[in-house]
Amino acid sequence: MGRKFKVGFIGCGNMGTAMLKGILASGQVDKSQVAAAEKFEAGRKRVEDLGVYVTSDNGELARESDVIFLVVKPYQQEEVLPEIRDNLSVDQIVISVAAGVSISSVEQALMSIDVAGKIKVVRAMPNTPALVGEGMTALSVNANITKEDEEVILSYFNAFGKAEIVPESLMDVVTGVSGSSPAFVYMFIEAMADAAVAEGMTRAQAYKFAAQTVRGSATMVLETGEHPGALKDAVCSPGGTTIEGVCALEDGGLRPTVIDGVRAATQKSRDMSK
């Protein structure tokens, strides 16, 4: 595309920096092809240490980057979009990582005489495990994004976890099943560890056993392609310890409670988007 940078980041807090590190580590782009716009000293220091170009001028970054990641909070994005609007052309991709901000609202904010209705916009929702390279990101794209664009975008987000393109209408569901659910999983790990501590295990060991078991079980689901119920059944011997524990969890309402939690988070996301 003839610009200085393949990738530009506006906003380099914890999430933005984690995404930037993942993309650099993947080897898809050299650090000389990456830029960041950051107005706060702490953020500037973080990205300068990575060896990428840093500016405080959002307009400059937008003008000189092929793909622009907006990793800022919604209220900050309202300020940033007008700053970059007149520096964009129709072959650039703008990726919004602001929670609850729709594609149409980004398009509206970027509307100008030169690029009216032609800007390529992506809405992204990564979750916090992206901070350790194990994120799950939902991506929704507008009508101007090509299949080739999708491949590029997916490759960047796969650098710090996994990514899927979904209809924007499912973004609230993504909030429930992916965005909010790390908190639910942490509660499950904590509860398992509490039980182990109650039975005599040290707290440090209990967290390690519980967390690694969750990680391994999740890997089994992803790598085997087996139904979670089938994997559960394979661990349950007739009259054994596991089926005894499963029955106790069923009696306690584990399934309906988890379902209620995911649906409550989904509904809250819908309510906040109105």
Show where each model-derived region lies:
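NAD(P)-dependent Rossmann-like dehydrogenase/reductase catalytic/cofactor-binding core
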Residues: 2, 211-274
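Hydrophobic residues within alpha-helices
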Residues: 19-20, 84, 192
